[in-house]
């Protein structure tokens, strides 16, 4: 029984969350669909792109916070659309002003428009500045275990390696690197990007990830609200399967019922 896993709460920046599904707000047809899908997902943490979303910086325009009130959801501002450390740091500081001094941010610094791979050099620079500036940094990164370790050593509170390209729906492309990151990293690891359907989310959780973040997999589904509910259950199922521990893989069959004592 020494290998039995015990459940631990999902804690970020000193706060405990029940849901291990984090969701984005982009790509929906309107704010009402956004609201309905996020409600169906059961998510408590909702990430928003500060440079693309009105959080109050544009008076007179629809404000996402009217649909997703901060007293109900933890708003996680992100730096989507930033391609260097300077832009990312500036965006995080703007988000802190807009959200009444809240320090929780999702850092992402992209390398190019085509792949949206993270620029890990600029990400490391930005992370170091933001941590020193008092931010609680959750960081989007590659599935390189060494970079993940360096980001954790800088002081990031969560490492968020991609499972596949952003918006690709390719699923968990490199589970082996994710396993190394999970073994070597002492802070929460969340899969970010690449999830396409419920089974992808379950696999990420079965590997041992603390949580999964997604947007396109829900927003681009034929029925986003229904997919949001599917993802809610997929994450729960994956977490339970991880805690339960899967059976060993075997090359040959093993009968469910013993052959001894068969009726003759």
Swiss-Prot record:
1-deoxy-D-xylulose 5-phosphate binds at residues 167, 193-194, 215-216. One of its GO terms (biological process) is thiamine diphosphate biosynthetic process. Pfam families: ThiG (PF05690). GO terms for molecular function: thiazole synthase activity. Pathway: Cofactor biosynthesis; thiamine diphosphate biosynthesis. It catalyses: [ThiS sulfur-carrier protein]-C-terminal-Gly-aminoethanethioate + 2-iminoacetate + 1-deoxy-D-xylulose 5-phosphate = [ThiS sulfur-carrier protein]-C-terminal Gly-Gly + 2-[(2R,5Z)-2-carboxy-4-methylthiazol-5(2H)-ylidene]ethyl phosphate + 2 H2O + H(+). The keyword Cytoplasm applies. It is found in: Cytoplasm. InterPro entries: Aldolase_TIM (IPR013785), Thiazole_synthase_ThiG (IPR033983), ThiG (IPR008867). It is an enzyme of class 2 (transferase). The active site is at 106 (schiff-base intermediate with dxp). Its EC number is 2.8.1.10. Its main location: cytoplasm. GO terms for cellular component: cytoplasm. Keywords: Cytoplasm, Schiff base, Thiamine biosynthesis, Transferase. Catalyzes the rearrangement of 1-deoxy-D-xylulose 5-phosphate (DXP) to produce the thiazole phosphate moiety of thiamine. Sulfur is provided by the thiocarboxylate moiety of the carrier protein ThiS. In vitro, sulfur can be provided by H(2)S. Homotetramer. Forms heterodimers with either ThiH or ThiS. PANTHER family: THIAZOLE SYNTHASE (PTHR34266:SF2). Belongs to the ThiG family. This is Thiazole synthase.
């Amino acid at each position: 029984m020494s290998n039995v896993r015990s459940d631990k709460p999902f804690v970020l920046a000193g706060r405990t969350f029940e849901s291990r599904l984090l969701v984005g707000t982009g790509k929906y047809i309107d704010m009402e669909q956004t609201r309905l899908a996020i409600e169906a997902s059961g998510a408590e943490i909702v990430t928003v792109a500060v440079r693309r979303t009105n959080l109050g910086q544009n008076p007179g325009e629809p404000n996402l916070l009217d649909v997703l009130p901060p007293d109900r959801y933890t708003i996680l501002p992100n730096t989507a659309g930033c391609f260097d450390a300077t832009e990312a740091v500036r965006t995080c500081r703007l988000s802190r002003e807009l959200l009444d001094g809240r320090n929780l941010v999702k850092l992402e610094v992209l390398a190019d428009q085509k792949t949206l791979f993270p620029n890990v050099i600029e990400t490391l620079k930005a992370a170091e500045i933001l941590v020193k500036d008092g931010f609680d940094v959750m960081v989007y990164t590659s599935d390189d275990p060494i970079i993940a370790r360096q980001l954790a050593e800088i002081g990031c509170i969560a490492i968020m390696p991609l499972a596949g390209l952003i918006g690709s729906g390719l699923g968990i492309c490199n589970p082996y690197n994710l396993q190394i990151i999970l073994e070597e990293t002492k802070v929460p690891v969340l899969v970010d990007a690449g999830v396409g359907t419920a089974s992808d989310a379950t696999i990420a959780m079965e590997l041992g990830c603390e949580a999964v973040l997604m947007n396109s997999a829900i927003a681009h589904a034929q029925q986003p609200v229904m997919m949001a509910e599917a993802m809610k259950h997929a994450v729960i199922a994956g977490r339970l399967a991880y805690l339960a521990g899967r059976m060993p893989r075997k090359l040959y069959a093993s009968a469910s019922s013993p052959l001894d004592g068969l009726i003759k």
